[in-house]
């Protein structure tokens, strides 16, 4: 896998968005002509190594769209966007979830998946797990199965994996 290359293209930005936070910036990875492709290929290899065989990919707004579409293309699968409220034109399911300061919601079309689908959730970052768990809850409202979740990065020590206990969770890089 290209993990050293991928990690080298993620910039560490201290004190952003506030003092004491080390922000992991993926824009240099995306700006590299090979960055997105190598990341999607590494994700596909991780899935193969774990025996995960999804039938469709779901990506959480907004950076999950970038990596999710790229991975879906590598896997030859379709892609479903998990959106912020009010962005989808047809009937939706919605899940509200808590943030550090307040709450937010995510939505998907009610007919986004078939009950036989094995859905792979893709996002750039696993931190506390709140957004990922809300995405899982949405998928399960459709009666589809969650095949697994894959992230480009995981921040250790923030309990994201514990929130997703019982699901197959992978991350390419841990910080």
UniProtKB/Swiss-Prot annotation:
EC id: 2.4.2.7
Pathway info: Purine metabolism; AMP biosynthesis via salvage pathway; AMP from adenine: step 1/1
Annotated InterPro entries: Ade_phspho_trans, PRibTrfase_dom, PRTase-like, UPRTase/APRTase
One GO term (biological process): purine ribonucleoside salvage
Chief location category: cytoplasm
Enzyme class: transferase
Keywords on record: Cytoplasm, Glycosyltransferase, Purine salvage, Transferase
Enzymatic reactions: AMP + diphosphate = 5-phospho-alpha-D-ribose 1-diphosphate + adenine
Record GO terms (molecular function): adenine binding; adenine phosphoribosyltransferase activity; AMP binding
A Pfam family of this chain: Pribosyltran
Record's subcellular location: Cytoplasm
CDD domains assigned to the protein according to its UniProt record, in alphabetical order: PRTases_typeI
HAMAP family: Aden_phosphoribosyltr
Function text: Catalyzes a salvage reaction resulting in the formation of AMP, that is energically less costly than de novo synthesis.
Subunit structure: Homodimer.
Family: Belongs to the purine/pyrimidine phosphoribosyltransferase family.
Name assigned to this protein: Adenine phosphoribosyltransferase
Organism of this sequence: Francisella tularensis subsp. tularensis (strain WY96-3418)
Gene from which the chain derives: apt
């Amino acid at each position: 896998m290209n993990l050293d290359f991928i990690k080298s293209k993620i910039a560490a930005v201290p004190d952003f968005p506030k003092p004491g936070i080390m922000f992991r910036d993926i824009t240099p990875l995306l700006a590299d002509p090979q960055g997105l492709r190598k990341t999607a290929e590494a994700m596909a290899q991780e899935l193969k190594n774990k025996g995960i065989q999804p039938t469709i990919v779901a990506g959480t707004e907004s950076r999950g769209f970038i990596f999710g579409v790229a991975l879906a293309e590598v896997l030859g699968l379709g892609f479903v966007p998990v959106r912020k409220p009010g962005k989808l034109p047809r009937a939706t399911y919605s899940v509200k979830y808590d943030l550090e300061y307040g709450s937010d919601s995510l939505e998907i079309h009610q007919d986004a998946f078939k009950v036989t689908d094995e859905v792979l959730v893709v996002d750039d970052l696993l931190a506390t797990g709140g957004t990922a768990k809300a995405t899982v809850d949405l998928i399960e409202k459709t009666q589809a199965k969650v095949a697994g979740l894959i992230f480009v990065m995981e921040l250790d020590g923030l309990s994201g994996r514990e929130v997703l206990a019982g699901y197959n969770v992978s991350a390419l890089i841990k910080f």
